[in-house]
Curated annotation (Swiss-Prot):
InterPro entries, sorted: Amidohydro-rel, Metal-dep_hydrolase_composite, Metal_Hydrolase, Metallo-dep_Hydrolases_sf
Single GO term (MF): metal ion binding
Protein name (database record): Enamidase
Enzyme Commission code(s) on record: 3.5.2.18
Cofactor: Fe cation; Zn(2+)
Length: 386
């Protein structure tokens, strides 16, 4: 049995928006899962465990990027960039959710081809995780000709996500709604493009389209990159219970509006964070951290709640056993602190001030995969593996 203990933690941010902060300073990990959370008494049974001294800094769940356009491996054809997933890991991202693979060279746009591509990419990312990141690839793009039997086959082969509705030849609610119903019947999670056209061949999607189609996730409610109006945002927020995704590669003004209005309505649990990259905007390795900083510093949202938007809110939508610090959850964790030179005293203070926190350690399934981030500024107090 492998065992890791993180001790001397200054603050634990749980990722659970109902209880964002845990009163504890020690986390025990066994065989890749969180086994216990408590105080120094947990060190009594340390045995030959690997000990990580957090040096008084903050531990959060590993971050989720709920909007990634992966195309196979750790390569982004749209921007001709290698190792973007590895770079995101150094920004604290331990799980990625595909929103479809529209940049795949020669992407097939028929039913057989889109199904085959989804199955291939899903299996490939589960077979080989780039840099250890948990990539849920192979989100199927809806194309004309798909049948209910296709969804049954895809689910059997491991595909469980429908990429942004509107990226393929299925564009209007009349065509999309029956496929979404099949997808839900067979256990898929469904995303839907929202806002202006993003790539040639995609479509503009309104609040009315979203309401009629009934996805699980309103993809980039703040635009990808062109946003719907605040009136359309209000309709989605008031007339549905769908998850609302704020992305880094979108409209910051609408992101602020969504966060503030969700807070007013007591609906911050519906807000999740993605990057919407690779895209024409580019690649932003620290995009999820930037979302957290933006929403906390500019929209008056508590930084601990902003962390939940990047972690537990997302895993609740997608049904994943990570993103929350609790016994039995996968031990995907970040140790972070205020960066050198910040006005803040700790990581949450830095996020509230708009400063990117410094990451000193990232763990996936309890194994340290980053021991000093190459992309964040240096942490004032760096964790050490003893």
């Amino acid at each position: 049995m492998s065992k890791t203990i993180i001790k001397n933690i200054g603050k634990i941010v749980s990722g659970d928006i109902k209880s964002p902060v845990l009163q504890a300073d020690t986390i025990v990990v066994e065989d890749g899962l969180i086994a216990a959370i408590g105080g120094e008494e947990l060190m009594k049974d340390a045995g030959d465990a690997t000990i990580i001294d957090a040096a008084g800094s903050t531990v959060t769940p590993g971050l989720l990027d709920t909007h990634v356009h992966v195309s196979g491996g750790d390569y982004a054809p749209r921007q001709k960039t290698m190792d973007f997933i590895s770079s995101a890991l150094h920004g604290g991202v331990t799980t990625m959710i595909s929103a479809g693979s529209p940049h795949f060279p020669g992407r097939p746009k028929d039913a057989a081809g889109t199904k085959a591509l989804a199955i291939t990419l899903s299996k490939s990312y589960y077979n080989a995780r780039p840099a250890g990141v948990k990539v849920h690839g192979g989100a199927v793009i809806l194309e004309k000709g798909l049948t209910e039997e296709d969804f049954i086959e895809m689910k059997k082969e491991g595909v469980w996500i429908v990429g942004e509705v509107g990226l393929g030849t299925i564009k209007n609610p009349e065509d999309a709604a029956p496929m979404v119903e099949w997808a839900h019947k067979h256990g898929f999670k469904v995303q839907m493009h929202t806002g202006g056209t993003s790539i040639p061949g995609s479509s503009t999607v309104t609040a009315d389209d979203v309401i009629k189609t009934k996805p699980d996730v309103v993809s980039h409610i703040n635009g990808g990159p062109t946003a719907i109006s605040v009136q359309e945002v209000d309709r989605i927020m008031d007339e549905t219970d769908f998850a609302m995704e704020i992305v880094q590669c979108g409209n910051p003004k609408i992101a602020d509006y969504v966060a503030r209005r969700a807070a007013e309505k007591g609906q911050l649990g519906r807000v999740i964070f993605g990057n919407d990259a690779p895209s024409g905007t580019g690649l932003i390795p620290l995009g999820i951290l930037r979302n957290m900083c933006q929403i906390a510093s500019m929209s008056d949202i508590d930084p601990e709640v902003a962390v939940c938007m990047a972690t537990g809110n997302s895993t609740a939508v997608y049904g994943l056993n990570t993103g929350v610090i609790a016994p039995g959850k996968e031990a995907d964790l970040i140790i972070m602190d205020t960066p050198l030179g910040s006005v803040a005293e700790d990581a949450m203070g830095a996020i509230a001030a708009g400063d990117i926190p410094g990451i000193s350690v990232v763990l996936i399934d309890g194994e340290a995969v980053v021991t000093k981030s190459r992309n964040t500024p240096p942490a004032k107090r760096a964790a050490k593996i003893l």
